[in-house]
Curated annotation (Swiss-Prot):
Other comment: Is not encoded in all strains, and seems to be dispensable for replication.
Primary residence: host cell
Upper lineage: Viruses, Riboviria, Orthornavirae, Negarnaviricota, Polyploviricotina
Organism: Influenza A virus (strain A/Chile/1/1983 H1N1)
Described function: May play an important role in promoting lung pathology in both primary viral infection and secondary bacterial infection.
GO biological process: symbiont-mediated suppression of host cytoplasmic pattern recognition receptor signaling pathway via inhibition of MAVS activity
Protein name, per record: Protein PB1-F2
Length: 57
């Protein structure tokens, strides 16, 4: 699937674009996964921080 679509891109831009596209596809996939985990961690931390802050107040 990706190779068929990459064929015209390679002829149009060059193999450099193909490498960049592959790298870009890998980066967002990892970032998306990290973003979700980070968000969950952030929410947990925020909840823990907000709870004691409210009690202190």
């Amino acid at each position: 699937m990706g190779q068929e679509q990459g064929t015209p891109w390679i002829q149009s831009t060059g193999h450099i674009s193909t490498q960049k596209g592959e790298d870009g596809q890998k980066t967002p996939k990892l970032e998306h996964r990290n973003s979700t985990q980070l968000m969950g961690h952030y929410q947990k931390t925020m909840n823990q921080v907000v709870m004691p802050k409210q009690i202190v107040y």
